[in-house]
Amino acid sequence: MVELTLATLLGTVAGDFCELRNEGRPVLESVLLAYSKANDQYGGKNVRNVISGSFGLEAQAISFVVTKCPDKL
């Protein structure tokens, strides 16, 4: 199994977040659903490990979303 990286996780979550926002869902609902999908895809323990070991997570997450769908934040 390939090790989950922060870049992979954020890319997945940002893509799902943008899709959900395009459907008209609120920001918080979109974040929670995208995170939930990542847990399903990569496993909750893997997601938690990547998040807990990350530096500057908030800034990196925002930059992924702004790159993928700048009008959705």
Enumerate the language-model features and the residues they cover:
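Compact alpha-helical subdomains of small soluble proteins
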Residues: E29-L73
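Short N-proximal segments of mature Sec-exported proteins
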Residues: V2-R48
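N-terminal secretory-pathway/extracellular module detecting exported/lumenal segments
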Residues: M1-E3, P70-D71
